[in-house]
């Protein structure tokens, strides 16, 4: 399997993404010599990894943008036949300890969401994974109102984490951004701040964009 060279500039990245529009996941996988999983129950990240590979993304699981040299984060988004997102979008792991001095401006969420290349993919379960097609990509930069909503949610969530209230945070908190347990394995543990200021063990959490927010982004482009 040949490794794809990262795109040199933004027009090249966009050209690659547009060339995938209308193509099935099976076609992309065949070009890379990969087999397509029957379903995504055990391979939840497979589609995203395939698209990353095809576009030449470099970050992998590192805490930085997928195309750091271009200032672009890549997000695949499963959609229904009406073009609506089918699930929330994972942004990054949430820091649950050592958060003194952390601000929105220097947070990983802010860094990742400065500029996002959204790649919609058919995601309805009745369509076999191999036959699901890739949609038209969208390059998005949050406008001032969207940035304000993201910052507001992030600051409120981080304040509750700092107060040791991580267990009280549910997916309902936040207008556009939510905090949820991240690990597929519920036995995975990480340090977090307890209400008395000491450290305790808890399940890792991740930041996710709510579907109402990503639907708004898609709607602005596709109407």
From Swiss-Prot:
One of its GO terms (molecular function) is DNA binding. One of its GO terms (cellular component) is cytoplasm. It is found in: Cytoplasm. InterPro entries: DNA_mismatch_repair_MutH, DNA_rep_MutH/RE_typeII_Sau3AI, DNA_rep_MutH/T2_RE_sf, Restrct_endonuc-II-like. One of its GO terms (biological process) is mismatch repair. Keywords: Cytoplasm, DNA damage, DNA repair, Endonuclease, Hydrolase, Nuclease. It comes from the Bacteria. Sequence-specific endonuclease that cleaves unmethylated GATC sequences. It is involved in DNA mismatch repair. HAMAP family: MutH. Belongs to the MutH family. This is DNA mismatch repair protein MutH. It comes from Shewanella baltica (strain OS185). The gene is mutH.
């Amino acid at each position: 399997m040949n490794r794809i060279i990262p795109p040199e500039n933004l027009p090249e990245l966009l050209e690659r993404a547009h060339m995938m529009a209308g193509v099935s996941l099976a076609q992309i996988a065949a070009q890379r010599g990969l087999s397509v999983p029957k379903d995504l129950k055990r391979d939840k990240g497979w589609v995203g990894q395939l698209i990353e590979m095809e576009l030449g993304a470099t970050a992998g699981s590192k805490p930085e943008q997928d195309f750091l040299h271009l200032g672009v984060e890549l997000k695949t988004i499963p959609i229904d036949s009406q073009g609506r997102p089918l699930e929330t979008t994972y942004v990054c792991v949430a820091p649950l300890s050592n958060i003194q001095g952390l601000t929105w401006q220097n947070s990983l969420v802010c860094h990742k969401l400065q500029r996002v290349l959204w790649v919609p993919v058919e995601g309805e379960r009745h369509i076999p994974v191999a036959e699901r097609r890739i949609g038209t990509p969208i390059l998005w930069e949050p406008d001032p109102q969207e940035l304000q909503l993201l910052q507001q949610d992030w600051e409120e969530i981080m304040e509750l984490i700092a107060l040791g209230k991580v267990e009280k945070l549910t997916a309902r908190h936040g207008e556009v951004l939510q905090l949820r347990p991240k690990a597929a394995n519920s036995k995975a543990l990480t340090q977090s701040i307890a209400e008395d200021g000491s450290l305790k063990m808890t399940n890792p959490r991740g930041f996710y964009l709510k579907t109402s927010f990503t639907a708004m982004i898609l709607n602005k482009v596709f109407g």
